[in-house]
A protein has these predicted regions:
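Post-HExxH zinc-binding segment in Zn-dependent metallohydrolases
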Residues: 90-118, 127-129, 133, 207
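Conserved helix-loop functional segments at active or binding sites
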Residues: 6-17, 40-43, 72, 76-84, ...
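Short pre-active-site segment immediately N-terminal to the catalytic Zn-binding motif
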Residues: 45-67
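C-terminal, non-catalytic "cap/extension" segments appended to globular domains
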Residues: 66, 74, 104, 112-118, ...
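Post-HEXXH active-site segment of zinc metalloproteases
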Residues: 64-65, 76-100
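Short, glycine/acidic-rich hinge or "gate" loops at secondary-structure transitions
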Residues: 17-23, 82-89, 108-123, 221-228
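Short beta-alpha connecting loops at secondary-structure transitions
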Residues: 51-55, 82-92, 121-130, 149-151
């Protein structure tokens, strides 16, 4: 709790007070238990405070998961307090922005405070893995999905062999010639449930990019950026998601936020290479 609160200090006292309320008033089911489902999520209803499920073991990943889920919860808290029921839930396009923004602020704080080389490398590696899984991998998923729809429109039969060969080619394209792809990876598409919700996965990549851009603005500008960000959190679904993000200072109709996120990725890779 202390690490997360320290990392989120740039958000200002009002945000920290909501965070503290959640920590001290049993919003969170913290530990593993018999019969409890795995993973983590944030939920609740319009007239209740948010609820968070964790399976906390004290690992670094668990700390980031706490920051992530509390990002969802504070987003829901602001939205429900400031919008009527009909507009109180936010759209999928912005659903991962607040959670990932928290993670970006936390990694910045932890890297700033540690001088231990091994710890720095562990932190950077953790965030790079998150980056790879959220931007590169989800973009690959989205391109795969697009190609499948394109083939269907052209009247090509979507046999298991056709789908698998396309998926394998994309893996080889995205991960490059230096990565040896097992043939079995060609079948991975069949175990990814997100493909049953058409054009869902690309929003992970756009949300992550927006979150990186917003966290950078908060760290660089301070209070003015925080106020714009809180306006976004309070917006629920009262505006188009693109327009809501514009109120926070991020224009997702341009390539700039995505490029800025890729620049952060490159910078972190450079830092890791210097330490090896």
């Amino acid at each position: 709790k202390k690490m997360v609160a320290e990392g989120l200090k740039p958000m200002g006292q009002e945000y920290l007070d909501i965070l503290k309320e959640g920590f001290e008033n049993r919003w969170i089911d913290v530990y593993e238990n018999e019969g409890k489902r795995s993973g983590a999520y944030s939920g609740g209803s319009y007239d209740s405070h948010p609820y968070v499920l964790l399976n906390y073991r004290g690992t670094l990943d668990n700390v980031f998961t706490l920051a992530h889920e509390m990002g969802h919860s504070v987003h829901s808290y602001y939205s429900r307090k400031n919008q009527p029921y009909a507009y109180s839930d936010y759209k999928i396009f912005v659903a991962e922005v607040a959670s990932t923004c928290n993670e970006a602020l936390l990694i910045h704080d932890l890297l700033k405070k540690t001088s231990d080389k091994a710890m720095k490398m562990t932190l950077i590696n953790h965030f790079l893995d998150k980056f790879k899984g959220t931007i590169y991998r989800q973009t690959m998923f989205a391109e795969f999905e697009y190609l499948m729809h394109q083939k269907a429109q052209e009247g090509k039969p979507l046999t298991a062999q056709e789908i698998s060969s396309t998926y394998l080619e994309l893996n080889q394209l995205y991960f490059g010639p230096d990565m040896v792809s097992d043939q079995e990876i060609a079948l991975e598409w069949s175990r990814i449930p997100h493909f049953y919700t058409p054009f869902y996965v690309y929003q992970y990549a756009t949300g992550f990019s927006a979150a990186i851009a917003l966290s950078n603005k908060i760290l660089e500008e301070g209070a003015p950026a925080v106020e714009r960000y809180k306006t976004f959190l309070k917006g629920g679904s009262s505006m188009d998601p693109i327009d809501l993000l514009k109120t926070a200072g991020v224009d997702m109709t341009t390539s700039q936020p995505v490029q800025a996120a890729l620049d952060v990725f490159g910078s972190l890779v450079d830092q890791m290479e210097e330490m090896i």
